[in-house]
A protein has these predicted regions:
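Short acidic-glycine loop/turn motifs at beta-strand connectors
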Residues: 1, 25-26, 164-165
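Phosphoinositide-dependent membrane-docking surfaces
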Residues: 3-14
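Well-ordered beta-strand positions
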Residues: 10, 23, 161-162
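N-terminal intrinsically disordered, acidic low-complexity segments at the extreme N-terminus
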Residues: 13-50
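A Zn2+-metalloprotease active-site environment signal
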Residues: 44-287, 296-326
């Protein structure tokens, strides 16, 4: 006869129908095919199963766990991860942003820009920089991070991109779209400065990495499919939030510089005119590419003003119209 204390026995996780097993420290084990009798003996002996095992034996427990898991993911996405990413991003030294920005600029030049240099004359480029610098000069000291404005001939049409580390890329087509209107171009740059002020590039990277990691941990074996989808959904949500923050920053900069926020409304009007002009005659918006945008816009969805996850144009237009009225 072999006697072993219950606390020295290893009890594998049970299932509803399979045989019951116990493992001993000396390598031996016992099996019982009468699951009901084994379970009755276990209850009488005071053996308690972990809560997870109990939940797995009940469809109600599984359903409740799934609901709690989804709620936890949503709460993390809405509040936890943005706060964590903001904290992590601001704790990182700025040279990390600069290194990331340089790598991103190389990718942008290779994938989105034309090989030839900008066609905007140097004097015109400097005029745009000077106007923007004057608007920023009215802000309180310390609110403006280091920045550099560069111009590129692009394959993506009118656009402007704020890269980590302080580089702002403006395409020639953006300047041409608004006929070199200084107020409108300053408004565009003010929006991009909002991204730099909030370090959105670094925050987006940290948030997506955190969301993917947390999703993989929580979703377990389903992480390959579901965690990737959760990360994409989260990234889109975070991008919309970033755009709203950048729009609010643009309004502050424009007001400080004595420029009406209605300048951004002019930009959206010009973009809408360009989209209408690029459509085939009689073709409705929703049939022309994605959301009625032209092929150039399709290439730029991952960066800049035509980002696919930007808030709807109508929402943003209303925001700047209200801001222009002083609200």
């Amino acid at each position: 006869q072999h006697t072993v204390a219950l606390h020295q026995v290893q009890w594998p996780e049970r299932t509803r129908q399979a045989q019951r097993t116990a493992h001993f420290s000396d390598g031996g084990s016992v099996q019982c095919t009468d699951a009901a009798a084994w379970d009755a003996w276990a209850r009488q002996s005071g053996l308690r199963e972990p809560l997870v095992v109990c939940l797995q034996q009940s469809w109600r427990g599984v359903l409740a766990s799934a609901v709690l898991l989804v709620a936890a993911l949503l709460a993390l996405q809405q509040w936890g991860l943005p706060l964590a990413a903001r904290t992590v991003a601001h704790a990182l030294p700025t040279h990390v942003d600069e290194a990331l920005g340089q790598a991103t600029l190389r990718a942008v030049d290779e994938q989105l820009m034309k090989p030839e240099p900008s066609a905007i004359p140097p004097a015109e480029q400097e005029r745009i920089r000077t106007a923007f610098r004057q608007a920023l000069g009215k802000l309180p000291a310390g609110e403006v991070p280091p920045w550099e404005l560069v111009f590129r001939a692009s394959r993506i049409g009118p656009n402007a991109l704020a890269l980590p580390g302080g580089t702002i890329v403006m395409t020639d087509e953006m300047v041409q779209l608004v006929d070199s209107n200084t107020d409108v171009l300053t408004a565009v740059l003010a929006h991009e400065m909002g991204h730099l002020q909030h370090r959105h590039g670094m925050r987006m990277l940290v948030q997506v990495m955190l969301l993917g990691t947390v999703s993989s941990v929580l979703l377990g074996d389903f992480s390959t499919v579901l965690a990737g989808g959760a990360a994409l959904v989260g990234q889109s949500h975070y991008s919309r939030q970033a755009e709203r923050e950048a729009d609010a920053a643009a309004v502050r900069i424009l007001r400080a510089g004595g420029i009406s926020p209605a300048a951004m409304v002019t930009l959206f009007d010009r973009l809408a005119e360009k989209r209408r002009a690029s459509k085939a005659p009689g073709q409705p918006d929703e049939k022309n590419g994605k959301d009625g945008k032209d092929g150039n816009d399709e290439k730029a969805h991952w960066l800049g003003l035509t980002f696919a996850s930007h808030p709807a144009d109508a929402e943003r237009v209303r925001f700047f119209q209200e801001a222009a009225k002083g609200r």
